[in-house]
Amino acid sequence: MESLTLQPISKIDGQINLPGSKSVSNRALLLAALASGKTTLTNLLDSDDIRHMLNALKALGVDYKLSEDKTVCEVNGLGQAFKSTTEALELFLGNAGTAMRPLAAALCLGEGEFILTGEPRMKERPIGHLVTALKAAGADVEYLENENYPPLKIKGTGLKGGNVDIDGSISSQFLTAFLMAAPLSSQETTINIVGDLVSKPYIDITLDIMATFGVVIENKEYKTFVVPANQSYIAPGEFLVEGDASSASYFLAAAAIKGGSVKVTGIGKKSIQGDVQFADALAAMGAEIEWGDDYVIAHKGELNAIDMDFNHIPDAAMTIATTALFAKGTTSIRNVYNWRVKETDRLAAMATELRKVGAEVEEGEDYITITPPAMLRHATIDTYDDHRMAMCFSLVALSDTPVTINDPGCTSKTFPDYFDKLKELSV
């Protein structure tokens, strides 16, 4: 297996223009495909997860042109649901939850038979709450291997709407997927959320993009969503993909630990992504943060431990776990049960790897506490085919200790040139 050893970084300083957001890119691509008219997406993320979505759309008959650097995509929308004349068209979606879940819902609207599959880890990531909701709305979906998990076989029969319950406690992607399909149902859909809805800011991203594509939804305090029937997505013409706020977290944290200062552009006060709130968590730890409409600047600060509920920003919360290695006291990251069903079981993985560098760690069912050692140890970090594990643990190099990252290429899921960008900021 390939590995990368990062030598100690004495200072971080500079500016980074963020790659496009994964969450925004894949949502916008799907809606552009369903819309009538042409959409030009700019600052599209070039990564594995986006490639899986693009490959699926091509197989589904969507005509698009991708620029040479893969950041501009012109999509000629179908103006209707997907159709397949191939018997059981198979779509391989890697480990891309942002492709698997929304496509599972969207394909129920169309005509034909579809099989959705992916990498072994994808077959361990739950999808049962979404499938149950789709079936309640009239969909024909079956599990091909294990109950509640991909791969799925879908027969396009349309969605009839009605009253549907969705469990919101594991992943907001189930609700996102259903919301994006519901406007094309034959009857009005009322979606009732069962349990506490996790990652609410990701639902805001979904609703914002749907509105941009001309669809109306009534949100009743995130408990009930009413979606009028027989709507159509309309191409907005130009669509700028915001920078990826989760990806910004590593550079903002690096500046807080070892700045100088770092300015990240592509997100800011006007961002639709909840993960920009990571900067508030850094500020609570003692970093100095400046906000613009489309940029955030972080300066070095004396960092102290925090005890915080991170249910709203679970992805960016991972960066707090390794930032905690540089903070005084014990940091507690709470209410992140859904770490367990992400690219890997992130609570177990994070606890294991933090202990390798010398931290004292308590891993609970839905929380983790981290007490840093007096001095970090040089360790070889396993990344579990999880892009965020690799990027989070790169921050260890901001100490006086090197760090070795196994399988650094796993960052290609969302940020293929992450380590190059980190090097550019290292003084």
From Swiss-Prot:
InterPro entries: Enolpyruvate_Tfrase_dom, Enolpyruvate_Tfrase_sf, EPSP_synthase, EPSP_synthase_CS, RNA3'P_cycl/enolpyr_Trfase_a/b. Keywords: Amino-acid biosynthesis, Aromatic amino acid biosynthesis, Cytoplasm, Transferase. PROSITE patterns: EPSP_SYNTHASE_1, EPSP_SYNTHASE_2. One of its GO terms (cellular component) is cytoplasm. GO terms for molecular function: 3-phosphoshikimate 1-carboxyvinyltransferase activity. It holds the Pfam family EPSP_synthase. It is an enzyme of class 2 (transferase). Its EC number is 2.5.1.19. The keyword Cytoplasm applies. The active site is at 315 (proton acceptor). It is found in: Cytoplasm. GO terms for biological process: amino acid biosynthetic process; aromatic amino acid family biosynthetic process; chorismate biosynthetic process. Phosphoenolpyruvate binds at residues 22, 97, 125, 173, 346, 388, 413. 3-phosphoshikimate binds at residues 22-23, 27, 171-173, 199, 315, 338, 342. It catalyses: 3-phosphoshikimate + phosphoenolpyruvate = 5-O-(1-carboxyvinyl)-3-phosphoshikimate + phosphate. Pathway: Metabolic intermediate biosynthesis; chorismate biosynthesis; chorismate from D-erythrose 4-phosphate and phosphoenolpyruvate: step 6/7. Belongs to the EPSP synthase family. Monomer. Catalyzes the transfer of the enolpyruvyl moiety of phosphoenolpyruvate (PEP) to the 5-hydroxyl of shikimate-3-phosphate (S3P) to produce enolpyruvyl shikimate-3-phosphate and inorganic phosphate. PANTHER family: AROM/DEHYDROQUINATE SYNTHASE (PTHR21090), PENTAFUNCTIONAL AROM POLYPEPTIDE (PTHR21090:SF5). NCBIfam families: aroA (TIGR01356). This is 3-phosphoshikimate 1-carboxyvinyltransferase. It comes from Aliivibrio salmonicida (strain LFI1238).
